Amino acid sequence: MSSKINTLIRLFETIEKRSNDDPTKSYTAQLLSEGKEKCIAKVREEALETVEAAEQENISQIVYESADLIYHLHVLWKKFDLKPDDIYSELESREGKTGIKNE
């Protein structure tokens, strides 16, 4: 499982590296250069596509759209200068509590 987690770490590292690339040559740099609204719109779009795939019970499409969603979430985090550790720390703080909501 840890090698799978490392994939997420490498994804964010790649996004960080590409954030300074030429936006005409890097999709990641293009998204980041277009501002927070574009990043937010892409997360919204990919979340909706993931939900639609789930409604259709299309397992392969759920996996595909989930990967897109995770990528775009990472780009959004970068746009707001967040690191995966910020999110992991929040999740860790919720461990062992009733429900997922931090009250």
Mark where each language-model region is.
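Flexible "arm" and connector segments at domain edges
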Residues: 1-66, 70-103
